[in-house]
Amino acid sequence: MYEYIKGTLTHIDGSYVVIESFGIGYAIMLSERFLVDLRAFMHQEVLIYVHSVIRETEHVLYGFSSRAERECFRLLISFSGIGPKTGLSILNMFPLQELCSIARLENVKAIASVPGIGKKTAEKLMVDLKQKLPTLMPLYLEEPVVPSSTANSSFKEGIGALMNLGFSRLAADRMMTEAVKELSEEASVAELLPIALRKS
C-alpha cells in the first residue's frame, strides 16, 4: 500500500496525472479541483497522497492534496452505494471544510446534488458524516502538498492569509512561490501579498 507518491509531474489529462518517480510513471486519478491546482506545477516535483483500489483486472490510484482529504475519501467510500468515482465527485464539489459544514447543518439537498447520489443515500450518508467528519479536521492543518523551498515566516503567513480569503492550500502555495520569485525570500508578507493576489 502506498502512503504518498513524490516525483515529477510529467502529464495532465482530463481526469488523471502522471507522476514520474525513479523511472516509473504513476497514473493517478484526481478530482477536477485538484487537477486545476496542479497545472501550475507541470514538470516540478509534487507530493500526492494516494489511495489504492485493487481489482482483478486493474489497479487504480486515487490522489489527494492532503491526508485529511484522503481519509475523507476513505470514509465516503466505506458507505454502501458510494464507489471511488462518486467519492471523488463529492470531494470535487465540496472541499473538506465545506463538507463538514454541510454535515453539521444536515444539508441533505447539497449532498443529493452530487451525480450518482439519491436523496435516500444522502440522508443515510449525512448521519455518519455529521459524526465522523469533524475528527478529520486536525489533519487538514498540515503542510502543503507541494512543499515550497521557501520556509520563512512571511511565506507561511502569506499562505495562511490567502487561505483565509478562500484559496486552496495548493493554490496559495503556488501564488506565494511566484511572488517570492518576483521579489525575494526576504520580502515582508505585506509586500508579497499584493503580488501573490495578481497571480491568482
From Swiss-Prot:
Gene Ontology, cellular component aspect: cytoplasm; Holliday junction helicase complex; Holliday junction resolvase complex
Compartmental location: Cytoplasm
Taxonomic superkingdom: Bacteria
MF term (GO), any: ATP binding
Region (Domain III): 150-200
BP-aspect Gene Ontology terms: DNA recombination; DNA repair
Keywords carried by this UniProt record: Cytoplasm, DNA damage, DNA recombination, DNA repair, DNA-binding
Stretch list, region Flexible linker: 145-149
Annotated Gene3D superfamilies: 5' to 3' exonuclease, C-terminal subdomain, DNA helicase RuvA subunit, C-terminal domain, Nucleic acid-binding proteins
Sequence segments annotated as region (Domain I): 1-65
Signal sequence region: none
Region (Domain II): 66-144
InterPro entries: DNA_helicase_Holl-junc_RuvA_I, Hlx-hairpin-Hlx_DNA-bd_motif, NA-bd_OB-fold, RuvA, RuvA_2-like, RuvA_C
Pfam families per the UniProt record, alphabetical: HHH_5 (PF14520), RuvA_N (PF01330)
Function: The RuvA-RuvB-RuvC complex processes Holliday junction (HJ) DNA during genetic recombination and DNA repair, while the RuvA-RuvB complex plays an important role in the rescue of blocked DNA replication forks via replication fork reversal (RFR). RuvA specifically binds to HJ cruciform DNA, conferring on it an open structure. The RuvB hexamer acts as an ATP-dependent pump, pulling dsDNA into and through the RuvAB complex. HJ branch migration allows RuvC to scan DNA until it finds its consensus sequence, where it cleaves and resolves the cruciform DNA.
Subunit structure: Homotetramer. Forms an RuvA(8)-RuvB(12)-Holliday junction (HJ) complex. HJ DNA is sandwiched between 2 RuvA tetramers; dsDNA enters through RuvA and exits via RuvB. An RuvB hexamer assembles on each DNA strand where it exits the tetramer. Each RuvB hexamer is contacted by two RuvA subunits (via domain III) on 2 adjacent RuvB subunits; this complex drives branch migration. In the full resolvosome a probable DNA-RuvA(4)-RuvB(12)-RuvC(2) complex forms which resolves the HJ.
UniProt domain comment: Has three domains with a flexible linker between the domains II and III and assumes an 'L' shape. Domain III is highly mobile and contacts RuvB.
Family of this protein: Belongs to the RuvA family.
Protein name: Holliday junction branch migration complex subunit RuvA
Organism: Chlamydia trachomatis serovar L2 (strain ATCC VR-902B / DSM 19102 / 434/Bu)
Gene: ruvA
